[in-house]
């Protein structure tokens, strides 16, 4: 007896060298080298046919390693840029770095021994700081490139370069000449820990700050004209009650502020905690304050707030008289007493009241946060350490303290040193926002904000903000180009002095301020008086540095444009870079520096917690890409999985990441890759030039698939156009898994493997596969750039395009759209799902192994659908187009449309829905050795007795 014939070599199995495993650690750098060697980005950014597109980079700080926030931010930018490149835009992306400022200065100082610090001149410190910033910038650039980010890495912008600094001086100069820059004694956020003024954007408000809050009474010594009659009976024992969370500011008290729209009451209190039998408080607060003071307060008289204006009180700690004055709407009954202790040297609102009434500015605190001699008995005490205790004790002794309690609230901390700040009045340079606030608010309305609530965030910030303190008392920064008259202390700041400094900085950089003499730094007309001047020692706020990038980069570089198309940063930048850029641009040019502003949230761990070393929950992007020390626990996923994560999240709010999420994304990545591999493998012998089947000749299944491809890639395009990348993620995942793997490719295997290689049955399927793989590669390219390029390099046929990125965006045809076809195939897919349920029941009972072991019975009550299905169920396998058949759609050897439910109920296994009732019985005939389908014709062919009629025809080229 002879061995049965083997048909293994007659089956068209997939062939491709496209690896199932990404091997990203090795492969991704190879693909990045391919892009670099072929200058793909450079050529596209110059030669693309559409207009220039500029996403202007918000500069990360050149300090420390890259973290997940960097990864989210830079990848989002790169997704947009790569999409725009594929759409034919000349994308010009110049990465930038913020290089000045305190954090770098502190890092440098911390790295030095105390002996080294002793002889440290500003110039030496600046050289060390520059070296540190440049080294960090190089390391960060390497990391960004490994993420797959494209840009002009050879010519980044750094805020420390001469050309940048000179352009920034230009912005400062134009603002100064318009009268927007002034010097003044004003309370500013002051950091005693770093001994400099801070901008709002340099503050953070950690949870859990507890202050010592006090209620105190100041003795009334003279009633105002309007209250004489009412207050006279109580005067000798009357105090005005105030509340404060900063007792240390009491030495600076110069007024008490009230709300003119509130009513106030004189109340009697009968405890002996303080010297005053009678107190003035807001009438609405009497009940609450009775509870707080733990004593009954009895109302003796009420009076309108306005009437109390100019009532005189004595300071409880000094022999100093002050007045009760009208404050603003910040005086409320939400907390406190309805009367606010006012120290114009220690608060913005207090300062405004002081200005209105011509009060002085008393701020008896030095740069380290210690009281000066002006505070008399408290001189030398530190306001954040021991001052509160001493002041509270003295108030107690004087009989002024009503109550002390702990108060938990948000309090500003220095974002770098993580230590509390204070309000302190100092001589500083300011940008007067008042002069261009309305123009800024108008400019905000011209911008597209994504998400839309971004506009609601930045608008009140700009409309409510105080003047911008732009000076810093540090060495590592761009010097404010001002000279002071030695005798009068008057600043010298003119168009000529600014222009002269700008020219010097453009050539030599800002070190020249320290290196050159005053005479050399002054223009000709002032040189003779050089001996009368000294240089200023203040540097500019780093937010003025980065906020000038529109001028130093977007406007200055000829290949870019201003305003930029888009700015994209974290939501904290509404009070940071978005705002500083807006203010400088509006001040100088009366326009916003951007057309669109897109913001993203922060990266949290899987449980929604902030990442911190102390919690041990930090996810390192480098570990995601290259793996950790223990590669079993922290496998190397490569940059594409990281990029896929970025596309998967709704970045408009805070986004989680962790091991479980990465594992899930890795699985999805693998599914997309395996789908691509199947497509490539089944195109190994396909040449689109000669083997493509025309649309008219395609079977209905293939035409339906082209309709789905049109739907899918229209949705993907819209997702990118609207920056909703999570829609791209969901659509592509669904397309690869549900439309392709679980449906079309599942059905296609029979056509691809067992048909004659040249048959239209196979070539029509390959036509669809080629369209699917090319469009899939292009569609994933903005996100999974490495996988997309890898796919393109393994296309088994020639294309005119060297790279997926030079091939342009997805291409579909209007001809493929067919909504009627789509509706009828939605029903067929519903039937297929129901059949799968019934087959699964049979499989569980071990009645069948493969679905090909089954014959499927279908009962379809809807007449139209039944008629449609009948045309998909030819009498035998060799009539029809060999594709549009129910048996192939449901992966069974035979299908019978039955006339009654009884046949279904008599079947071994059944499943029912409104659409269809399904029965499963054993397939008829014998199993074909070649295609594994059952057929009653197996055994009829003398030369090939073990195969079916389809395979017999396929072997001679007829199927």
UniProtKB/Swiss-Prot annotation:
Record text on cofactor binding: Binds 1 zinc ion per subunit.
UniProt keywords, alphabetically: Aminoacyl-tRNA synthetase, ATP-binding, Cytoplasm, Ligase, Metal-binding, Nucleotide-binding, Protein biosynthesis, Zinc
Binding site for ATP: 613
GO BP of this protein: isoleucyl-tRNA aminoacylation
Presence of keyword ATP-binding: yes
EC annotation from Swiss-Prot or TrEMBL: 6.1.1.5
InterPro entries hit by this protein: aa-tRNA-synth_I_CS, aa-tRNA-synth_Ia, Anticodon_Ile_BEm, Ile-tRNA-ligase, Ile-tRNA-ligase_type1, Ile-tRNA_ligase, M/V/L/I-tRNA-synth_anticd-bd, Rossmann-like_a/b/a_fold
Subcellular location as annotated: Cytoplasm
Description of its domains: IleRS has two distinct active sites: one for aminoacylation and one for editing. The misactivated valine is translocated from the active site to the editing site, which sterically excludes the correctly activated isoleucine. The single editing site contains two valyl binding pockets, one specific for each substrate (Val-AMP or Val-tRNA(Ile)).
Annotated function: Catalyzes the attachment of isoleucine to tRNA(Ile). As IleRS can inadvertently accommodate and process structurally similar amino acids such as valine, to avoid such errors it has two additional distinct tRNA(Ile)-dependent editing activities. One activity is designated as 'pretransfer' editing and involves the hydrolysis of activated Val-AMP. The other activity is designated 'posttransfer' editing and involves deacylation of mischarged Val-tRNA(Ile).
Name recorded for this polypeptide: Isoleucine--tRNA ligase
């Amino acid at each position: 007896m002879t061995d049965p014939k083997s048909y293994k070599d007659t089956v068209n199995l997939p062939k491709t060298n496209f690896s199932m495993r990404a091997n990203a650690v090795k492969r991704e750098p190879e693909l990045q080298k391919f892009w670099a060697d072929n200058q793909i980005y450079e050529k596209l950014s110059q030669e693309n046919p559409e207009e220039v597109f500029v996403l202007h980079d918000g500069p990360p700080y050149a300090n420390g390693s890259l973290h997940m926030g960097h990864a989210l931010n830079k990848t989002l930018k790169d997704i947009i840029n790569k999409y725009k490149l594929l759409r034919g835009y000349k994308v010009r992306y110049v990465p930038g770095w913020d290089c000045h400022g305190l954090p770098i200065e502190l890092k440098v100082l911390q790295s030095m021994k105390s002996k080294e610090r002793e002889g440290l001149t500003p110039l030496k410190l600046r050289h060390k700081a520059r070296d540190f910033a440049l080294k960090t910038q190089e390391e960060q650039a390497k990391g960004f490139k490994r993420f797959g980010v494209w840009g002009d890495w050879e010519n980044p912008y750094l805020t420390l370069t001469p050309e940048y600094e000179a352009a920034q001086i230009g912005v400062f100069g134009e603002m100064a000449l318009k009268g927007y820059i002034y010097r003044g004694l004003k309370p500013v956020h002051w950091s005693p820990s770093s001994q400099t003024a801070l901008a709002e954007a340099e503050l953070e408000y950690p949870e859990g700050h507890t202050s010592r809050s006090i209620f105190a009474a100041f003795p009334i010594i003279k009633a105002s004209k309007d209250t004489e009659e009412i207050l006279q009976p109580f005067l000798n024992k009357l105090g005005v009650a105030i509340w404060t969370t900063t007792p240390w500011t009491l030495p600076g008290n110069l007024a008490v502020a009230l709300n003119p729209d509130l009513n106030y009451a004189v109340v009697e209190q009968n405890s002996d905690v303080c010297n005053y039998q009678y107190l003035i408080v807001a009438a609405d607060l009497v009940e609450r304050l009775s509870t707080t003071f733990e004593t009954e307060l009895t109302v003796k008289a009420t009076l309108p707030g306005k009437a109390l204006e100019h009532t005189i009180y004595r300071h409880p700690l000094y022999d100093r008289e002050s007045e009760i004055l009208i404050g603003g709407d910040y005086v409320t009954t939400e907390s406190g007493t309805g009367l606010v202790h006012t120290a114009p040297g220690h608060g913005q609102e207090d300062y405004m009241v002081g200005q209105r009434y011509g009060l002085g500015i008393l701020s008896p605190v030095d740069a380290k946060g210690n009281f000066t001699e002006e505070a008399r008995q408290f001189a030398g005490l530190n306001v954040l350490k021991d001052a509160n205790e001493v002041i509270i004790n003295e108030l107690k002794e004087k009989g002024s303290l009503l109550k002390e309690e702990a108060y938990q609230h948000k309090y500003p901390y220095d974002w770098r040193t993580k230590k509390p700040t204070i309000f302190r009045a100092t001589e500083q340079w300011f940008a007067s926002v008042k002069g261009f606030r309305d123009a800024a608010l108008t400019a905000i309305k011209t911008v597209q904000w994504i998400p839309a609530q971004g506009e609601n965030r930045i608008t009140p910030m700009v409309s409510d903000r105080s003047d911008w303190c732009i000076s810093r008392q540090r060495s590592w920064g761009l010097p404010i180009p001002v000279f002071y008259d030695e005798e009068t202390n008057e600043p010298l700041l003119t168009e000529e002095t600014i222009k002269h400094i700008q020219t010097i900085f453009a050539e030599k950089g800002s070190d020249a301020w320290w290196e050159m003499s005053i005479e050399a730094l002054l223009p000709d007309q002032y040189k003779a008086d050089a001996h009368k001047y000294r240089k200023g020692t203040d540097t500019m706020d780093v937010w003025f540095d980065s906020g000038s990038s529109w001028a130093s980069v977007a406007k200055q570089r000829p290949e870019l444009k201003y305003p930029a198309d888009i700015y994209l940063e974290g939501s904290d930048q509404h009070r940071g870079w978005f705002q500083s850029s807006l203010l400088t641009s509006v001040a100088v040019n009366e326009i916003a520096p951007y057309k669109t502003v897109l913001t993203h949230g922060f990266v949290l761990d899987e449980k929604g917690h902030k990442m911190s070393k102390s919690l041990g929950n930090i996810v390192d992007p480098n570990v995601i890409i290259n793996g950790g020390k223990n590669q079993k626990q922290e496998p190397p996923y490569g940059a594409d999985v990281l990029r896929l994560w970025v596309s998967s999240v709704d970045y408009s709010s805070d986004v989680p990441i962790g091991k479980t999420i990465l594992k899930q994304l890795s699985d999805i990545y693998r599914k997309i890759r395996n789908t691509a591999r199947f497509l490539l493998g089944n195109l190994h012998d396909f040449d689109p030039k000669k083997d493509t089947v025309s649309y008219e000749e395609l079977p209905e299944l293939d035409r339906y698939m082209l309709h789905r491809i049109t739907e899918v890639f229209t949705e993907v395009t819209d997702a990118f156009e609207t920056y909703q990348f999570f829609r791209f993620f969901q659509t592509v995942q669904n397309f690869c898994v549900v439309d392709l793997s679980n449906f079309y490719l599942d059905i296609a295997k029979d056509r691809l493997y067992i048909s004659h290689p040249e048959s239209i049955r196979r070539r029509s399927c390959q036509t669809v596969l080629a369209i699917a793989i090319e469009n899939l590669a292009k569609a994933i390219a903005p996100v999974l750039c490495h996988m997309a390029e890898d796919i393109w390099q393994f296309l088994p046929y020639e294309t005119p395009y060297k790279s997926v990125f030079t091939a342009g965006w997805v291409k579909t045809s209007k001809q493929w759209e067919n909504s009627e076809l789509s509706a009828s195939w939605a029903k067929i897919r519903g039937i297929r799902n129901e059949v799968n349920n019934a087959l699964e029941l049979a499989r569980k009972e071990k009645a069948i192994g493969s679905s090909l072991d089954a014959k499927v019975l279908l009962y379809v009550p809807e007449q139209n659908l039944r008629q449609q299905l009948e045309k998909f169920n030819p009498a035998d396998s060799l009539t029809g187009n060999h594709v549009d058949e129910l048996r192939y759609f449901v992966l069974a050897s035979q299908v019978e449309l039955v006339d009654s439910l009884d046949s279904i109920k008599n079947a071994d296994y059944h499943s029912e829905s409104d659409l269809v009732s399904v029965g499963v019985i054993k397939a008829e005939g014998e199993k074909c050795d070649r295609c594994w389908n059952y057929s009653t014709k197996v055994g009829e062919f003398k030369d090939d007795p073990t195969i079916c009629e389809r395979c017999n025809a396929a072997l001679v080229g007829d199927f």
